[in-house]
Amino acid sequence: MRMEWPALKAAVSGCTECALHAKRDKTVFGVGDENADWLFVGEGPGADEDAQGEPFVGQAGKLLDSMLAAIKLQRGTNVYIANVVKCRPPGNRNPEPGEALACEPYLDRQIDLLRPKLIVALGKVAAANLLATDASVASMRGKVHDYRGTPLIVTYHPAYLLRSLTDKAKAWADLCFAVRTMEGLQSGANAPRS
């Protein structure tokens, strides 16, 4: 898939590759700076995102915006936000493997076009799809993983953090680790490994 941004957005908008398209209100392509160094990847749109056509606009989105602000980032400025799937799974369930596979070329092309310096996988579904693993978030935290030559860090999904307040401190540690990793990448030093 060699499409540029406008053609890729149009392809996602017209996609019928899996059953999720049948009940969507809008596709949720992604949002942000198309030249961003930071890419945050979630699992899929919820009801608010389906209605607005933008990722992370509900309560989890408000928390993500606060998390970004805490590390001196903001949506749309050197940050791009995307999801593994571009249509809402019914009942906010996790995307099924076939659904994620149908959207994989779109996310891959977004990453190719962005060429981010760092990817942050938000939650197990994003990490599992980007890293082809079924490992737990807890076991993947605190390490720099590799996604086709791009450093990738795993943390908890903001929706999970809304339900599990005790893991917010761990997510903060992950964000601090991401900042240190990015600083190392920008200075040309090797990224920290733990």
Regions found by a protein language model. Name each.
Residues 1-194:
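A polyanion-binding, active-site-adjacent surface
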